[in-house]
């Protein structure tokens, strides 16, 4: 199937909410080796975000059930085995994306904007792996996530306006990484607050086409700050990551 057909099929799959099909189409487009257009890049990102998001959500539910069934050995074993099955799926998806990023997407990125987008994506998918990692593996995975976010963050500060939705989305997710994965609420708050304040100070640089995206992410940054600085330290913190682009 040629590239245009694959892209059309991915759009059709998106409308049908068949994200596994959508991801498979965009994976094939990526493997053809050409740099992706903005539209193709967004289709790839949306597809995998939904595919991995379904597993992350299932994993949380089953993990919670597993913890609640302590003492009921049979039930707990069933929940544990099911959680492990979901984890395997989740890892396979993340490794698929990380392989596309390493082989094609990051090396082919010719603009700072694409480079930041893909490095942020690398940080995100290592973060999803870190959520389910345990033991010796975990530290290496967390380091990979942090390095990708940090590299993206440095490029974005040099090359992009503080109001750019990709720069803001990166700050949002990097701050969630500090809060959730590194358990560093101070660092998470400082990063989110700086990103929010810098964007507010330059609101006049907001371009018309990204106005909606940028203001939505600014709202999420502010919501997270409110949540993180209040005493309620619950896992709702993750909610702040839901509206990134």
Curated annotation (Swiss-Prot):
Result after altering residue 232 to A: Loss of phosphorylation by CK1
SMART domains, alphabetized: 14_3_3
GO cellular component: blood microparticle; cytoplasm; cytosol; extracellular exosome; extracellular space; focal adhesion; glutamatergic synapse; hippocampal mossy fiber to CA3 synapse
Post-translational modification note: The delta, brain-specific form differs from the zeta form in being phosphorylated. Phosphorylation on Ser-184 by MAPK8; promotes dissociation of BAX and translocation of BAX to mitochondria. Phosphorylation on Thr-232; inhibits binding of RAF1. Phosphorylated on Ser-58 by PKA and protein kinase C delta type catalytic subunit in a sphingosine-dependent fashion. Phosphorylation on Ser-58 by PKA; disrupts homodimerization and heterodimerization with YHAE and TP53.
The organism of origin for this protein: Homo sapiens
Self-association state and partner proteins as the record states: Interacts with CDK16 and BSPRY. Interacts with WEE1 (C-terminal). Interacts with SAMSN1. Interacts with MLF1 (phosphorylated form); the interaction retains it in the cytoplasm. Interacts with Thr-phosphorylated ITGB2. Interacts with BCL2L11. Homodimer. Heterodimerizes with YWHAE. Homo- and heterodimerization is inhibited by phosphorylation on Ser-58. Interacts with FOXO4, NOXA1, SSH1 and ARHGEF2. Interacts with Pseudomonas aeruginosa exoS (unphosphorylated form). Interacts with BAX; the interaction occurs in the cytoplasm. (Microbial infection) Interacts with Epstein-Barr virus protein BPLF1 and TRIM25; leading to inhibition of the type-I IFN response.
Pfam short name (any one): 14-3-3
BP terms from Gene Ontology: angiogenesis; cellular response to glucose starvation; ERK1 and ERK2 cascade; establishment of Golgi localization; Golgi reassembly; lung development; negative regulation of apoptotic process; negative regulation of innate immune response
List of residues that carry Phosphothreonine: 232
Protein name: 14-3-3 protein zeta/delta
Keywords, comma-separated and alphabetical: Acetylation, Cytoplasm, Host-virus interaction, Phosphoprotein
């Amino acid at each position: 199937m040629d590239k245009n057909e694959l892209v059309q099929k991915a759009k059709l799959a998106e409308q049908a909410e068949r994200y596994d099909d959508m991801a498979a189409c965009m994976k094939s487009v990526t493997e053809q080796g050409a740099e992706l257009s903005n539209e193709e890049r967004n289709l790839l990102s949306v597809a995998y975000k939904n595919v991995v998001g379904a597993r992350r959500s299932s994993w949380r539910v089953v993990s919670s059930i597993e913890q609640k069934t302590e003492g009921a050995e049979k039930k707990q074993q069933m929940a544990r085995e099911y959680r492990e099955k979901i984890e395997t799926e989740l890892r396979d998806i993340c490794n698929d994306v990380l392989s596309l990023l390493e082989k094609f997407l990051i090396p082919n990125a010719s603009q700072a904007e694409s480079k930041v987008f893909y490095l942020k994506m690398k940080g995100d998918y290592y973060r999803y792996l870190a959520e389910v990692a345990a033991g010796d593996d975990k530290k290496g995975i967390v380091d990979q996530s942090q390095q990708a976010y940090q590299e993206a963050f440095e490029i974005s500060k040099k090359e992009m306006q503080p109001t750019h939705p990709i720069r803001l989305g990166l700050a949002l997710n990097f701050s969630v990484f500090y809060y959730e994965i590194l358990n560093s609420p101070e660092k998470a708050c400082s990063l989110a607050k700086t990103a929010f304040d810098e964007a507010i100070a330059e609101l006049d640089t907001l371009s018309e086409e990204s106005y909606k995206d940028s203001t939505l992410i600014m709202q999420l940054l502010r919501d997270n700050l409110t949540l993180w600085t209040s005493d309620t330290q619950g896992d709702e913190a993750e909610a702040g990551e839901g509206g990134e682009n």
